[in-house]
């Protein structure tokens, strides 16, 4: 009997693995039980990382490319357009106005329905980190 959790379309499995081989092995193991995958920066930056995203989409999977883009608006626009043209369902960017505007403009220019997710604060930041970068607490 298959668990409902493993067939729930809301479940996104993170391919936060160190190698393409391990990521592909996980996808093979999970087979048709999972319909959505997140590919993080480590795999996306490896040779074949973006190709893996395309392979998953070709298999009918929903693909979340977790780039967390953060640069000047024009650069984010170009990167978001490239990601959108290549096929992506969800794309992360940092939640700064020029970054988000650039991402939406690039996505739209790419003729895609890619959803843009804005990261407001990295969960890895401690209170001390936030104070150091100017977000002090009273």
Question: Which positions does each model-derived feature cover?
Answer:
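Generic structural signal for well-ordered alpha-helices
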Residues: 24-27, 50-53, 80, 100-104
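Hydrophobic faces of well-ordered beta-strands that scaffold small-molecule active sites
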Residues: 9-15, 35-39, 63-67, 91-93, ...
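N-terminal amphipathic alpha-helix/helix-capping segment at the start of soluble metabolic enzymes
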Residues: 1-28, 57
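Conserved anion-binding
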Residues: 5-9, 71, 75-138
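Active-site cofactor/substrate anionic-group-binding motifs, chiefly glycine-
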Residues: 38-41, 52-72
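Catalytic domains of carbohydrate-active enzymes, especially glycoside hydrolases
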Residues: 29-38, 86
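Short, small-residue-enriched loops and turns at beta-alpha junctions
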Residues: 19-21, 42-46, 69-74, 123-126
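Surface-exposed amphipathic alpha-helices with a cationic face
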Residues: 31, 53-58, 104-111
């Amino acid at each position: 009997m298959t668990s409902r959790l493993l067939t729930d379309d809301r479940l996104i499995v993170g391919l936060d693995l160190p190698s393409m081989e391990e990521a592909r092995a996980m996808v093979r193991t999970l087979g048709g039980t999972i319909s959505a995958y997140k590919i993080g920066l480590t795999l996306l930056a490896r040779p074949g990382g973006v190709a893996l995203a395309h392979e998953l989409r070709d298999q009918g999977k929903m693909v979340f490319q977790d780039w967390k883009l953060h640069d000047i608006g024009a650069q984010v626009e170009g990167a978001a357009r490239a990601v959108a043209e290549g096929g992506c369902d969800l794309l992360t960017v940092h939640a700064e106005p020029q970054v988000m505007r650039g991402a939406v403009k690039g996505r739209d220019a790419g003729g895609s329905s890619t959803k843009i997710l804005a990261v407001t604060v990295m969960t890895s930041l401690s209170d001390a980190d936030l104070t150091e970068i100017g977000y002090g607490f009273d």
